Design a protein with these regions (language model features):
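Amphipathic alpha-helical scaffolding segments comprising HEAT/armadillo-like alpha-solenoid repeats
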Residues: 56-70, 91-113, 133-145, 164-176, ...
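Hydrophobic membrane-insertion alpha-helices, especially the h-region
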Residues: 34-54
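Conserved hydrophobic register position within alpha-solenoid helical repeats
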Residues: 81, 124, 155, 186, ...
Length: 326
């Protein structure tokens, strides 16, 4: 069988490529352009114009916008606006856009929220911690006796953020409440306030019957370079101690320490037992580092070598390496 001549093949390809287009081919091309390409192009241009105009007209909601929604919005929109309010308050105050009139309006809306969806009041109490203003302190102190426990907890965290020592006696009172969750929140709130009454109150909480209240007290003291809670920190680092307390029993986020403020206030999903254990150990390790408590070096060395959580190991490594460099 004769082999095809390469030159002949190339000639045929060139002839086909340069051959005149038939009328039928031209008609088909025009139909495709008319019924497919042109309509699609028109749709894409219209979509681009719509999106462009949308981006030009959409404005970021301000704190005033959210506050107005809380006043006049529907059932769901009110609590959602209260939730979002906290995300913009801090920045707007930093930029000087929060004036006296807004603070007064925020207080009035909070006071009027008593018969509303409890979430509105909870999130408003939390939002008050995102800005500092003396007028908010009295309102938050009054909210410590709110019938809704979550609102009380949020108010305690916001009082810590305000940094006003007027809240100290009220938080000390709650630190002896029958509810361990409220006691823990009060201890955390006290830890952020500078007042002579705070250290004795935290030292008293080191003997609380609830472990996580004791842990919080030890951490708050350590943050102030007070080593009165060193024994409690040692307990937290003891092998099997956390597991022996039923840490993996699925208890709620509210009843565990060392979450971020948003977690404690119920604004994030419940953490897994593994993450809760990790957070507890890492916070305890950091506290040991703050106190330069080298007597607990063996516990840190064990965590560095044997703990199953790599982040816990890393936290221990950082403290131990820091000690070696000194």
């Amino acid at each position: 069988m004769d082999q095809p001549n390469p030159e002949e093949e190339l000639r045929k390809i060139a002839e086909d490529a340069t051959a005149p287009v038939s009328d039928a081919d031209v008609s088909r091309a025009r139909l495709v352009s008319q019924f497919v390409i042109f309509p699609v192009a028109i749709i894409l241009v219209a979509l681009a114009i719509y999106l462009g105009l949308g981006l030009l007209t959409v404005e970021r909601k301000t704190a005033e916008d959210y506050l107005n929604t809380i006043r006049v919005g529907g059932i769901n929109s009110r609590w959602q606006a209260a939730y979002e309010l906290a995300t913009v308050l801090e920045q707007e105050q930093r930029e000087g856009r929060i004036g006296r009139r807004f603070v007064g309006e925020l207080i009035r809306v909070f006071e009027a929220s008593r018969p509303d969806d409890p979430r509105v009041r909870r999130y408003l109490a939390a939002a008050m911690g995102r800005m500092r203003d003396p007028e908010l302190v009295g309102v938050l102190i009054a909210a410590l006796d709110d019938p809704d426990d979550e609102t009380r907890i949020n108010a305690m965290f916001s009082l810590r953020a305000q940094g006003d020592p007027d809240a100290v006696p009220h938080l000390i009172r709650i630190a002896s409440n029958d509810d361990a969750g409220l006691r823990k929140a009060a201890v955390y709130g006290l830890g952020g306030l500078d007042d002579p009454l705070v250290p004795p109150a935290l030292e008293q909480a080191l003997h609380d019957r609830a472990p996580d209240v004791r842990w919080n007290a030890a951490l708050q003291l350590a943050a102030a370079s007070n080593n009165a809670g060193l024994e409690v920190l040692g307990e937290m680092l003891t092998p099997g101690y956390l597991e022996g307390l039923g840490l993996n029993s699925g208890q709620s986020t509210r009843n565990l320490p060392f979450e971020t403020i948003r977690s404690v206030l119920g604004l994030s999903e419940q953490q897994s037992p593994t993450i809760r254990r990790r957070n507890i150990l890492i916070e305890a390790i950091k506290a040991v580092g703050i106190l330069d408590a080298r007597s607990l070096a063996p516990e840190l060395q064990r965590l560095r070598e044997k703990d199953p959580d790599l982040r816990v190991r890393q936290a221990a490594i950082e403290i131990l390496n820091g000690w070696e460099e000194k």
